[in-house]
């Protein structure tokens, strides 16, 4: 098992996540707010498989954090089909201390966009949310040169 896989296995909750990924208490508080909003919104909007909610730290947050670690110098990240915000919104929260970093989230479902906006505001994540289909976004953003493109 590689180092990133070991980190994900160890990140069973906020404390172990902080230790595994070397993040601040402030970042953990932001992710805890995200987790709370995810639970609340999940009742009315299908954001993740319901069976995965108890493993939000290891299954969703740690998986997303591993991607952030693979591209530490990325300045512009594009997350397609953002849905519940994985990995894009988690990466944006982890990189919130970098004023040169920007995350673009593309999601066609309006309810999911509202969720993404709610989490972004609460967690103070610098993101641009594009409420449209990927094809529409591609037509409108031809000059956007992303360092990383992700989709889950």
Regions from the PLM with identified roles:
Residues 1-74, 78, 111-114, 118-125:
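Class I SAM-dependent transferase core
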Residues 65-152:
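Conserved SAM/SAH cofactor-binding pocket of Class I
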């Amino acid at each position: 098992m590689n180092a990133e896989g070991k980190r994900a296995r160890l990140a069973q909750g906020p404390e172990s996540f902080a230790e595994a990924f070397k993040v601040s208490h402030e970042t953990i508080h932001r992710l805890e707010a995200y987790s709370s909003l995810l639970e609340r919104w999940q009742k009315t909007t299908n954001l993740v498989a319901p069976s995965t909610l108890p493993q939000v730290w290891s299954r969703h947050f740690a998986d997303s954090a591993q991607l952030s670690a693979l591209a530490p110098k990325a300045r512009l990240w594009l997350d397609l089909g953002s849905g519940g915000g994985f990995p894009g919104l988690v990466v944006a929260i982890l990189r919130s201390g970098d004023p040169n970093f920007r995350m673009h989230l593309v999601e066609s479902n309006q309810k999911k966009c509202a969720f993404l906006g709610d989490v972004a505001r609460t967690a103070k994540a610098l993101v641009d949310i594009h409420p449209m289909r990927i094809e529409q976004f591609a037509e409108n953003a031809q000059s956007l040169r992303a360092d990383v493109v992700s989709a889950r």
